[in-house]
C-alpha cells in the first residue's frame, strides 16, 4: 500500500489548483453547469495518483469525470501529474473528500457510473463495496447506473460478491481473471497498480453491478 507521507504544502497546492473543486457540496445537482454541458458524469472513488481517470477522460471526451481522493498527499500527486499533461482535459475535475459524503455532493441520478479500482481493504464495514457504501452509491446513481470494481485481492472480491447479493444488487458481469477475459477486457483502462500486479502474473478480479 502507498505510504502516505504528509507532503509539506500539499494542502496549499490543492487549494490553489483549478483542477480541484474546493466546495463540492455547492455543485450538488448542478454538475452539468460546472462542466458546461449535460454529458454523463462518471466518478472514480479513491483515484490514487489519477492515471486511470486521466486516461479515461482523454479516451472519452463525450463523458465528464470526477476523481475523488481522501488524502492530500495522494491528490497532490494527481494534480502534479495533470499539470504535466500536454492536453487540457476540460471534462475532468478532482475532489478531496471522504467517500462517505458522496450523497452530499451528487444528486440522486446525477452519476452515470462509479469506478472502484484496487480499493484499500479496510475493516469490512468501511470497504468501498460494503452494503453501507452500496447504499450511498444508490443515492447518487442514475436508474441504469453501474458500479465497476477491480481488485487483485481475492478475499475482498469474494466479500464484495456476497455484499452485492445481500444488498439486492444485480451482478451484470464478473471474472476472477480479467486479463484473460476477452469480453471484459474490451476497452479496459489500466491503473498503476493493475499494470504492476498483472505484470507480476497476479490475476485481476472485476465485477460490474447495478441496483
Give the positions of each predicted feature.
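Short alpha-helix adjacent to the SAM-binding motif of class I
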Residues: 76-81, 159
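S-adenosyl-L-methionine
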Residues: 1-41, 51-58, 80-109
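A short glycine-rich, Lys/Arg-flanked "PGG" loop and its adjoining helix->strand segment in the class I
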Residues: 129-143
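Class I S-adenosyl-L-methionine
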Residues: 162, 166-211
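Conserved SAM/SAH-binding beta-strand->alpha-helix loop
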Residues: 71
